[in-house]
Regions:
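Short, solvent-exposed loop/turn segments at secondary-structure junctions
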Residues: 16-20, 53-57, 80-81, 107-109, ...
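Conserved helicase ATPase core of P-loop NTP-dependent helicases/translocases
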Residues: 48-50, 58-59, 68-108
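SF2 helicase motor core recognition
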Residues: 57-61, 86-87, 99-147
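Conserved phosphate-coordination/catalytic loops
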Residues: 2, 25-33, 51, 80-87, ...
Length: 222
């Protein structure tokens, strides 16, 4: 069981930023390229990017600086920035007009809000929506006057599909415990899942010799 947990943890880290693993020999990972392209489409907007680990922050910071050398980049992690500095950051970010806030999701305290940010990118998922909402709700406030766009960037057909399904299933259970009997299809619509997520999930299977292997969705590998 411990070996399986270690494999899952490694797969999730590789999904977030494979170039943080010493054995990686490829170019810029596809997910980081996707996020860079999204930033290019939002070149005139302030954008926030929230990941879970500092090493992933560093990977994205390097790629962003290389792609957008003239665009303001603000990097925030829990151990590198004081609360006073984060409050000062709010003013500086707003004045930048098209700055990029790159941070760990847990580094933004509830006392500092960024209601002027309309686009939030989350390329690394938590295990439940309540943890992620603590981050993106820093940008969705009662005094917000514009529509907010929250983007969950994941690899389709990878372990991240399983993680997303778990997040959605937990959200359904959470709503049920609060007296809201919501259909899972409604949860899909709320989160913008417009594809057949169940068909791309990974599952653990056994072959005819009793050996465990991973099956990717409904694909049949021959």
């Amino acid at each position: 069981m411990m070996r399986l947990i270690q494999q899952i943890t490694l797969l999730l880290r590789i999904s977030a930023a494979p170039n943080t693993v010493h054995e990686y020999i490829g170019g810029t990972p596809a997910k980081i390229v996707k996020v860079l392209n999204m930033l290019d489409d939002m070149r005139d907007d302030i954008v926030a990017i929230g990941v879970r680990h500092k090493i992933v922050v560093n990977a994205y910071a390097e790629a962003i600086r290389e792609r957008f050398p003239d665009r303001p980049l603000f990097v925030v992690t829990g151990s590198t920035t004081t609360l006073a500095a984060r409050r000062k950051l709010r003013k500086t970010l707003r004045e930048s007009k098209n700055g990029i806030l790159l941070c760990t999701q847990q580094s933004l305290p509830s006392s500092v809000n960024f209601e002027f940010v309309d686009n939030v990118i989350i390329p690394e998922l938590h295990y439940n929506n309540s943890r992620m909402s603590q981050f993106y709700m820093r940008f969705i406030r009662y005094n917000s006057t514009r529509e907010k766009n929250i983007y969950f960037v994941t690899y389709l057909g990878s372990i991240e599909s399983n993680q997303m399904q778990m997040v959605l299933a937990k959200e359904k259970l959470n709503l049920f415990m609060r007296g809201q009997d919501t259909d899972l299809d409604d949860i899909y619509e709320r989160f913008g899942v417009d594809y057949d997520l169940l068909s791309v999930l990974m599952s653990r299977e056994m072959d005819e010799n009793g050996k465990m292997y991973i099956k990717w969705g409904e694909q049949n590998i021959v």
